[in-house]
Amino acid sequence: MGTTKHSKLLILGSGPAGYTAAVYAARANLQPVLITGMEKGGQLTTTTEVENWPGDPNDLTGPLLMERMHEHATKFETEIIFDHINKVDLQNRPFRLNGDNGEYTCDALIIATGASARYLGLPSEEAFKGRGVSACATCDGFFYRNQKVAVIGGGNTAVEEALYLSNIASEVHLIHRRDGFRAEKILIKRLMDKVENGNIILHTNRTLEEVTGDQMGVTGVRLRDTQNSDNIESLDVAGLFVAIGHSPNTAIFEGQLELENGYIKVQSGIHGNATQTSIPGVFAAGDVMDHIYRQAITSAGTGCMAALDAERYLDGLADAK
């Protein structure tokens, strides 16, 4: 494993929360070390247009925004390490973390590990992952040019994926278990325009029963009517994109931090220290602690808060010496 690297402040995650925390911590001369995780840049790297980032309304993409954040963090001399942490010890001081490429210790820790795409859990879905089943249209949509595809989900992500794929695929079948969609109104408006004048076909009150295929990959899906369970229909599609939400990346913290439905619990913030977890000196920011708002801007905001909380914590340690 080699030598252990120690830092005053370690940040886990390279999405908006992690990079923002790094900028604020670096400007406070905390000399932060940021561990990127396996998905450098987080979920925004799979997002095409970002229209709600204040001050940049035109032609901003997720990858571009994350590239700028990376540059901003490095400008203030954040040390960025590409590694994935697979084990932590938060019961002793300093905190100890083991990665694929090294071992790290720190006096304060900011967890900004984000969330990962959730799947339905069907055996047939698992069987065709990477062979026609995907959770990222911007990653894999290119492979389905002029082919029929299906998207399952009813929120912002599902509608965005369907709209994106409608510019690539010949037909996009959007499947949702309820009658109405939960997406933002502007996205619903665009969706309905594509339904009326384009190539998106809605299948509401339907659940995915099975993914069908052969040795080459996905060939179709079977849907069940939620209002008449005897009604099963089949669609011929070459790809299925699952967009049913995300699960927080907190598995390595189970049994060490207080969690709620997998999300890290933090303080209310009425008296400050809003991002502190159940262990003093460990802070959380972004989607790993927020299952409600889940926006790039709110993730960045909590990253800022975590850095300020960590700075105050470290100042307290220094004063106590």
Curated annotation (Swiss-Prot):
Cofactor(s) named in the record: FAD
GO annotation (BP), single: cell redox homeostasis
Cellular localisation: Cytoplasm
GO CC annotation: cytosol; thioredoxin-disulfide reductase complex
InterPro entries listed in its UniProt record: FAD/NAD-bd_sf, FAD/NAD-binding_dom, Ferredoxin-NADP_redctase_2, Pyr_nucl-diS_OxRdtase_2_AS, Thioredox_Rdtase
Main location: cytoplasm
UniProt: FAD binding residues: 36-43, 287-296
Cofactor binding summary note: Binds 1 FAD per subunit.
Class of this enzyme: oxidoreductase
Entry similarity comment: Belongs to the class-II pyridine nucleotide-disulfide oxidoreductase family.
Quaternary state and interactors: Homodimer.
NCBIfam families cross-referenced by the UniProt entry: PRK10262.1, TRX_reduct
Other facts noted in the record for this chain: The active site is a redox-active disulfide bond.
Identification of the protein by name: Thioredoxin reductase
Species name: Escherichia coli (strain K12)
Name of the gene: trxB
